[in-house]
Amino acid sequence: MNRTVQSYASAMFRVLKDDVYSPAVVQQQNTFAFGKTSSLCTDNHSANDQRERGENVRESSQNHVKRPMNAFIVWSRERRRKVALENPKLQNSEISKQLGYEWKRLTDAEKRPFFEEAQRLLAIHRDKYPGYKYRPRRKAKRPQKSLAADSSILCNQMDAETLHPFTYRDDCAKTTHSQMESQLSRSQSVIITNSLLQKEHHSSWTNLGHDRVTLASRISADFPFYQSLEPGLSCAYVQY
């Protein structure tokens, strides 16, 4: 009884060991490791891009100096708030159009306080930033999605070939072989179709030549009969 149990346990252990190291299980483990590595690589790239973009925006915001407000901006600050409160459904572009129209309708006397305030703010700005020159902001160019996708694909392929070179190359060879088989089958079908068309064309020309020979022999046989007819009636009998 003990020997039977031991032999059964050893057999089960061998089966489990063979299953663990079977090609299907190894391929499944390789696929899982490849997906995990590729996701980590993509996440690292996206995190680095976001970090660099955030640092660039922070540096540009710290170094950027705002322009001094002109008379229209000084006037429109308070007026924009009132218009937005009175008409909450209006969009910002519509409010800007309305403010521009109202500013044009103001008289010089009504605009004078705002010009004076703008001159005061300009003097303060010159004292604070003596060497200031207006430089408009440039929008940061985002990397193209296609380039990011290509880099991630290349990274995934490199990781796969580095981790499991034999499995990856075998899969590529199988894919190439299947593509060659499909192209060969297509070329064979094209050759067969062309040969059938040539045969049909040749048979049609053969039948046409046979009909011509038959017609000529028939006309030569009936030629004495046509000579015996009158000149006006011979054309009526030539038609078949």
From Swiss-Prot:
Q: Which domain of life is it from?
A: Eukaryota
Question: Which spans of this chain does the record mark as coiled coil?
Answer: none
Localization per record: Nucleus speckle; Cytoplasm; Nucleus
Q: Which GO terms describe its cellular component?
A: cytoplasm; nuclear speck; nucleus
The organism of origin for this protein:
Ovis aries (Sheep)
Annotated GO molecular function terms are:
calmodulin binding; DNA-binding transcription activator activity, RNA polymerase II-specific; RNA polymerase II cis-regulatory region sequence-specific DNA binding
InterPro entries, A to Z = HMG_box_dom, HMG_box_dom_sf, SRY, SRY-related_HMG-box_TF-like
- Protein name listed in UniProt: Sex-determining region Y protein
Under the subunit heading, UniProt states: Interacts with CALM, EP300, HDAC3, KPNB1, ZNF208 isoform KRAB-O, PARP1, SLC9A3R2 and WT1. The interaction with EP300 modulates its DNA-binding activity. The interaction with KPNB1 is sensitive to dissociation by Ran in the GTP-bound form. Interaction with PARP1 impaired its DNA-binding activity.
**Compositional bias per record (Basic and acidic residues), positions renumbered to this chain:** 46-58
Q: What does this protein do?
A: Transcriptional regulator that controls a genetic switch in male development. It is necessary and sufficient for initiating male sex determination by directing the development of supporting cell precursors (pre-Sertoli cells) as Sertoli rather than granulosa cells. Involved in different aspects of gene regulation including promoter activation or repression. Binds to the DNA consensus sequence 5'-[AT]AACAA[AT]-3'. SRY HMG box recognizes DNA by partial intercalation in the minor groove and promotes DNA bending. Also involved in pre-mRNA splicing.
